[in-house]
Amino acid sequence: MIQRRTVGIVGTGNVGTAAAYAMFNQSLASEILLLDQDTRRAEGEAMDLMHGQQLVGGITCRAVEYAALSNAQIIVLSAGASQQSPDETRLGLLQRNAEIFREIIIQLDKHAPNAILVVATNPVDVLTYICQELSSRPNRRILGTGTLLDTARFRALLGRHYGVDPRSVHAYILGEHGDSEVPIWSNATIGGQKIRGETVLGKEWEEEAMQSIFEQARDAAYEIIDRKGHTDTAIGLVIARIVRAVLEDQQNVLPVSTRPDGAYGIDDVCLSVPCVVGLEGMEKRVDPGLSDEEREALRDSARALRDSRADLTVGT
């Protein structure tokens, strides 16, 4: 018997809707199930997508309650509170989102205990850690989108700089999805040729130019938010990429947020390292052979993430 491929999305704001559109347009699943506290919003998004069904094929989309997620193989968590006022602290916002996620995890452990969870709400690394702490499912089955988007931005900018298809660029940003993230220059390559300190495709390595490229990738969200008020399109594609890797058991190596479990001397935190992603979620970790400087920067990133949740309290 052929099993229907079912994807759930909890939270139909800008990011959840962009993810639904990306998956719908790519026909990644048999059905996409949308759930939101604002049920009419979820219904409206499902209706809007279904009006394009004839153009993409037999995929269906509908608004549901938690019980309907029982057959979902993978569920995206894109719900979250927005800042209530300019005076609200980052910790205050994080505290409210942590409480929202606690309620979500209670429902998902009850109705969809076997589903892979993909966390997309920011701060994604801290919320991925919270989900792993609260959920009864194995940690490997809870991933965060992490630095996959940062890495995509990084490769796109490097591809533009060197005049090649970004898919021919192999370079990672690891660690926190945020200010402490780390560019991995030591093994960044184009066509197998290392970039750092080398002349590639007629372009010499210039430290200042490369630092600028990294900073553009790291700070891209701020620039986009300044212009359009939010980010959604690219992160929607990133979520679809992870969903495809899981549903099709692709065994892709992707920088997603998970627990290093002692790798690089890091524990008790979620951050992005290269992982093999397949049907079971995070199936293996890959050690890309970081330089001593990069390893220390990754440990600094882990410390920053631990500090960010130091005063957080989440009931169980």
Curated annotation (Swiss-Prot):
Beta-D-fructose 1,6-bisphosphate binds at residues 155, 170. Substrate binds at residues 83, 90, 122-125, 150-153, 231. The active site is at residue 177. Allosterically activated by fructose 1,6-bisphosphate (FBP). One of its GO terms (molecular function) is L-lactate dehydrogenase activity. It holds the Pfam family Ldh_1_N. GO terms for biological process: glycolytic process; lactate metabolic process. SUPFAM superfamilies: LDH C-terminal domain-like, NAD(P)-binding Rossmann-fold domains. It catalyses: (S)-lactate + NAD(+) = pyruvate + NADH + H(+). Homotetramer. Catalyzes the conversion of lactate to pyruvate. PANTHER family: L-2-HYDROXYCARBOXYLATE DEHYDROGENASE (NAD(P)(+)), L-LACTATE DEHYDROGENASE. Belongs to the LDH/MDH superfamily. LDH family. This is L-lactate dehydrogenase.
